[in-house]
Each structure stands twice: as C-alpha cells, then as structure tokens.
Amino acid sequence: LKVCGKAIVFGMQESAGLRSSGHMRFFILFLCVASLHARDIRVGKDVLTIHQAIRVAEPGDTIHLEAITYCDYAGFYGKKGAPGKPITLDGHGAILEGSEALEPAKWTEVSPGLFKNDELLPRLDDAITCRWFFLFDGLMQRMGRTSKGKSAPYKRPDELQPGEWTFIKDPSREKPPSKQTFGTFYIRLAAGVKLADANIFYPVRSAGVQFGGDNAHLVIKNLTATHPYNDGFNIHGDCRDVVFENIRAIECGDDGISAHESAQYRVDGFVSIGNSTGICDTGTAQTSYRNIFLARNIGFDLYFLDEGRYAITNALVLSSAQNPFSTTGREKGDCRLALENVLFRRLVEPRVGVIALNSIVTGKRCTFEQLDLKITGSATWEKSVMNGKATATESSAVGADVQTLLKLTPPDFRP
C-alpha cells in the first residue's frame, strides 16, 4: 500500500500473520535455527512483523527494516543480547508511524462540517488526551495544548474553525477508582468538504520505540519515530548497555525521547523536532547524548528531573519552547547534568531557564543566546558564554564551537 507516495507496511497480530500453513512451517524452521549463529533477520522477508523479529532475535542478531514507512512500533520487553553480542535493530532509514487515517464511517456529522466520535480509542485517560493531536493534510494540530507547559482550554464545538478539533469529557461514564476517561472528539471541516476527502490522521500508538522491564545489550539505529500520542522513544524499566545511533523523533505527542526509572543508555546522533518536549529524563536514569539537534519543540526543550545522572555533548538547540531549559532534583537526592560544547540559541522571545534546588549543572564550552538562567541549585561554567558575556572571569571564554555545531542541522530542516 502507498500513502503519499510512500510504501506502507502495516503491523499485524501473529495469529493473523501466520494463518497459512506455509508461513507457519517457515516460522517454526526459523525458530529452530535461531541458536546456530548470529543472523540477519529481515522484516517482511524472514518474518512478517517487527514484533516477530524482536521475539526471535538472539544475541548477535541484527534485525533489518527497509527505508519505508511502517505503521507499527518496536517494543522491547525483557529482551537481552549479551556482552559484546548485542541484538541490533537497524532501521536503514525506516519511519515508525504512530498515526493512521481517520475512518469516516465511525464519525457522525452533527451539523454541516462538524463531526463527532464518542469512542475514538478503545481506552482514554487524561495522560492521553493532554497529549492529543490530529493531522490535517499532514499538518499537526495541537490546538495550543501540550502535556508539559501551559495549554489552551478546549474550545466548545461551536467555536471550532475549519481544521480544528476539540474534546468534551463525559464524567457520567467514568467508573472510579479507574483513571479511564470518556468523552467526545469533534472536528470541523471547511464547508462542502467530505470527511472521506479530508486527509485526517490521528495517533493510535503510544510510542515509536518502547522499552519495559529488564532489557540489556541492545543497539537501535537509523530510524525515525513520528506521530505517536506519547513519546517517540519511551524507555522504561531497568535497561543496561543500550545504544541508540542516528535516531529521530518528529512531531510526537509528548517527549522526543524519555528515560524513566533506572534506565541507562547512550545516544549518538539524535534529532528531536516538533515534540512537546525535546528530551525529558527522570527517576534514577543515567543517560548520555552526543551530536543532537533540537528545534520547534513546544513545552520544554531540555528537561531533566529527579536523581538521574545526565550528560549532553555536542548539541545544537534552536529553542522556541515555553520552557527552554530545566533541571530539578529531589530532597533525598540531586539531579546532575553535564554539558559540553552546547549551543543554545533562543529563536523567539527571551525566556528564563531554571536550575532548581537539588540540581547540579556543569558546563564546558557552552553558548547561550537570548536565555538567562535562574539558579537556586548549583551551576559551574568553564569557557562558556551567556548572552555575549563570559560566564566566569576567564578572558579566554569563547563558548561552543558554533560552526561545527551548525552542521548538526538536518539537511531537510526549515526553521
């Protein structure tokens, strides 16, 4: 199937994908040779789905995707390679698409151009709806809302303009103590436009790449996550020796990438554009990022919390978020962030970054433009420049290597 000229491979349940006896025999044979040696597992050729490929992969194996768009996600739940023999997912430029086309038959026209749906997803809660968006003709419409930061109130249905949407909660359907919520989504089209012709997509997956449980010795590289209702790369649990290389998170409902609990990983090559938050790491996570580019994020650009240990080296941040930079720790333990060779360039009105209590930031060769910092925690700067002035008494403070960092800008990026 092709959508907008791109090849699409839809994820499917194993039970559906293996119904034919021929597929079943091949799949069993594939499992039998799994332990013989490191293999190349090609999704679409050797196995039908990304899920199947991850399930059968053993230490040393490489899962290969194609440079196409997959309406699917990559979930790692208790998956482990071995020291020196990681399991690798190589996207080869693949896109993991979190949205799907709206189904006109499931919507009711309540007045000319105004449509509603009472059960858009099987389950909703406030964490989902606060991240929600629709895509109208490929353009992301958040309605001024973001999961982290200030959000516009929902409009009344009669206030909607063409290309807008709203959500009206229905508390009468809720069943405490369940956090599940209910309500109705409304969308407005221009006069005379049929819903079937409107080219509207909505998010149906929570992430592009997701971790849960204990994972170890994994490499994920060369792929893009886009349009999930939560994070592009949603990393939960206790992971060790995990590497991400050349990854991108584009227009995700919440964070481009986010570490939770005690996750440990490193990233070399990351692009985060148009997300609610560029990077948000929490808990006792230990993460490092190298060669990263952030732009057009909404709520926060960089947000580091709790008792984690975090590092960023070689970063270009083109900031337009409500909250450009924030670190905050806990009373029982501090948050620590090390910055090196970072250019933080504010593109819109100046804002204040926050280094809050129980957080410690060290910066070496950093440049901040149009950004002041409110520091109630601890900050130490070396060879760094803040709004054209050295952050210390050093006469040799030249800041970040701007010309080199500007090369991190993706070739297809337009400010």
Pin down the residues of each PLM region.
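Extreme N-terminal basic, low-complexity initiation segments
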Residues: 2-8
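Short, positively charged and aromatic/hydrophobic N-terminal segments
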Residues: 8-9, 20
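Hydrophobic h-region of N-terminal signal peptides that target proteins for export
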Residues: 29-38
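Extracellular beta-rich repeat passengers
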Residues: 199-204, 215, 219-222, 227, ...
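Sec-dependent signal peptide recognition
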Residues: 23-29
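Extracellular polysaccharide-degrading/modifying enzymes targeting complex plant/algal/animal polysaccharides
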Residues: 42-44, 48-227, 234, 403-414
